[in-house]
C-alpha cells in the first residue's frame, strides 16, 4: 500500500500533478484580469445555491447549482468555463468540473472559490442578472 509519504517522494508524479493543476486552475487576480480584458472565450460559472449567488457573485457569472448539472445550460464547448463554489475546501467546483469535463466542456477551477475572491476585494455583482431561466435551452449571453 502506498502512503502519502511514498507519493511525495515520487518526483515524476509530483511533476505531472502540478502541471495538471496549473493547466486546470486559475486564481482570483488572473480571472479578474481576464474579465476586465473582455475575454470573449470565457464563461464564469457559479455552482453555489441560487440564494447565495443572488447575494453576490463574480461579475458576469452564470448560476448553475448542483441540481442543474445533468443539463448544464449556459456552458460552452467553444470557450473555457471557469467554475467556482464557496471555498477551496467545499470541492463543489471540483466535482462540477469532473462532471462538465465528462460531458465535453472545457473547464478550469477558480482556486479558493468565492470566499477568496472576496478576500482579494475584487468586484462583486449582486442579484440574479445572469441566472439562466428554467426551461430555457439557449446559452447564456456573455457580455464582459
Task: Give a label for each model feature.
Residues 1-43, 50-52, 126-144:
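Flexible, polar/low-complexity N-terminal or interdomain linker segments that lie immediately upstream
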Residues 38-44, 59-60, 80:
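Short active-site oxyanion
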Residues 44, 61-63, 107-109:
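Conserved beta-strand scaffold positions in the cores of enzyme catalytic domains, especially
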Residues 48, 66, 113, 130:
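Residue-level "edge-of-site" marker
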Residues 57-59, 103:
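Short, structured coil segments at secondary-structure junctions
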Residues 62-70:
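Glycine-rich, highly charged phosphate/nucleotide-binding loops
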Residues 70, 75-118:
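Catalytic cysteine-centered active loop of the rhodanese-like fold, especially the PTP/DSP P-loop
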